[in-house]
Curated annotation (Swiss-Prot):
It is a multi-pass membrane protein. Belongs to the major facilitator superfamily. DHA1 family. MdtG (TC 2.A.1.2.20) subfamily. It is found in: Cell inner membrane. Keywords: Cell inner membrane, Cell membrane, Membrane, Transmembrane, Transmembrane helix, Transport. The chain crosses the membrane at residues 19-39, 56-76, 90-110, 113-133, 144-164, 171-191, 222-242, 254-274, 288-308, 317-337, 376-396. This is Multidrug resistance protein MdtG. One of its GO terms (cellular component) is plasma membrane. The lineage of its organism: Bacteria, Pseudomonadati, Pseudomonadota, Gammaproteobacteria, Enterobacterales. PANTHER family: MULTIDRUG RESISTANCE PROTEIN MDTG (PTHR43414:SF6).
Amino acid sequence: MSPSDVPINWKRNLTVTWLGCFLTGAAFSLVMPFLPLYVEQLGVTGHSALNMWSGLVFSITFLFSAIASPFWGGLADRKGRKIMLLRSALGMAIVMLLMGMAQNIWQFLILRALLGLLGGFIPNANALIATQVPRHKSGWALGTLSTGGVSGALLGPLAGGLLADHYGLRPVFFITASVLFICFLLTFFFIHENFLPVSKKEMLHVREVVASLKNPRLVLSLFVTTLIIQVATGSIAPILTLYVRELAGNVSNIAFISGMIASVPGVAALLSAPRLGKLGDRIGPEKILIVALIISVLLLIPMSFVQTPWQLALLRFLLGAADGALLPAVQTLLVYNSTNQIAGRIFSYNQSFRDIGNVTGPLMGAAISASYGFRAVFCVTAGVVLFNAIYSWNSLRRRRLAIE
């Protein structure tokens, strides 16, 4: 029996990759609460300079990730997804360790860029599971896997803030590096993949990848959908705390209220993603995607008219429940419309679009709020998501007509 014929325990792989995504999500978000404080500790002074450098060290990771993702995706299709998971976890662990030793802002900026270059654990985990799980369970499996990163991202800032208060800023980077090394060990010992390496000559070029797709136009529309989902999420991030303060008035626990309102969509997505993924397996992920986008529009508009923080919290919880269906539905449709041979590259291209959205979303939100106020951000974001819903519906309708 050849290695590729050995049966894979995909359920165990799903469990271990979920843990890996949880640890990676936690590791990335552990340092987020105090990133501007660390920038200040590295010698940056003055309000405008601190804002500029904080924005740079935050966004440069996503920019370099967007650039590097297609390369790593191609390598994953040649060498296998497990080795890419190991490369990512170990590489990020080393970079996090070095971040704790940075002596000036330029060193830190370069290391943040390197973190983006070496990242990619979660998209490779998605590609691994997508190629192993039975197709009729893709929605449930990818929805479940998405909750790993969400859970880690929710707990990370809380843990990072507590650790920074007790031990200082630099030790948190060392703790984060340890968490990522644990992720490396879990992947090394417990994830199994039957993969026959492909020579560079046998690899499909970009044109051949596009030609091998069942519906290239639909796949491109799914990439655009991923970008817009991240733009919509990120556009609200820069103004959320300030908007909550405007709604709450002069209260002493504004940080707690803002933190809670920031986290409730993640909690809702955690609860909804596996269930909506399973529903998508039954009725079709395209229906879940369109309905979730329309619900998102209907929830974003009233956010610009709320009068209290609790009204905003309720709407954001409902929005999170809808958002929990979006990326897993996109990923499931990508699985349906591509082959295992090119899964690594398809998921890495999708990650690049996601990273671009992570950069442009906050910039859009900040620009709109500066010109038209906080409430306008929600209306414009609703308009962007509505465009996405119409665009996605049209792309999916064309696919259905082509099949008929």
